A protein has these predicted regions:
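Catalytic-site beta-strand/loop segments enriched in glycine and acidic/polar residues
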Residues: 109-141, 145, 203
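Residue-level detector of anion-binding/catalytic polar loops
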Residues: 93, 119, 148
């Protein structure tokens, strides 16, 4: 009996604490934004996009979203429900699924939503990793919806490791940056395995698909 009570208490309290912590960190550190002009141009034209960032950088990302009506892919595992409730406080909605649980259904739902005219948010390496190695889902999603992939990265001069998923970066007393990378170009040929660089915010493609 005690365990269910603690679980309910966790789901009730942690999202509010998480939301407040992210907001506080956002106000207390100097976060600058780089490379957002193409994103703002897309938004000004009423166009939608797929925002992609590494799983370990997810903690501060709700503060980076510049549009409205985004759906975020969140795992059904472990802390997924907590993340779902935290991002809901930022006005973001979620689709639940991962490569090991509900992935096919989640991909279908994301395709449907992307075609209906909303932004999509995905971590292409996922909670299970391998870290900073993009899986095929983001490429399949872009090809099926016609939406451009917009790479996003977060970096800070000092950071602690916070257990929000797999080691999210949690800045403390630091200078930080949200950096948007150039959109990768996808050909119409059957995609091979995407080979993204691990190097920070650039997300350069090193092989064609």
């Amino acid at each position: 009996m005690l365990k269910p009570l603690l679980s309910r208490a966790k789901l009730s309290c942690v999202p509010a604490i998480g939301y407040g912590t992210i907001r506080l960190l956002g106000h207390s550190i100097g976060i600058r934004v780089e490379g957002a002009q193409p994103v703002d141009a897309l938004l000004a034209q009423g166009k939608r996009m797929i925002i992609a960032f590494w799983h370990a950088q997810q903690l501060m990302m709700p503060l980076a979203y510049r549009g409205s009506g985004a759906y975020v892919l969140i795992s059904r595992h472990g802390d997924g429900e907590l993340i779902h409730r935290i991002i809901a406080r930022f006005g973001l909605q979620s689709v639940r699924g991962s490569s090991t649980r509900g992935g096919t259904e989640a991909l279908r739902e994301l395709i449907r939503l992307g075609r209906s005219g909303v932004d999509l948010v995905i971590t292409p390496d996922g909670p299970k990793g391998p870290r900073q190695v993009a899986k095929m889902g983001v490429v399949q999603l872009a090809k099926a919806t016609g939406l451009p992939i917009v790479p996003l990265a977060f970096g800070c001069s000092k950071k602690n490791s916070s257990r929000a998923g797999t080691g999210s970066s949690c800045p403390t007393r630091s200078r930080a940056v949200f950096s948007y990378g150039a959109r990768p170009s996808l050909s119409r040929r059957r995609p091979g395995h995407p080979n993204w660089s691990r190097n920070g915010s650039s997300w350069r493609r090193r092989s064609t698909v």
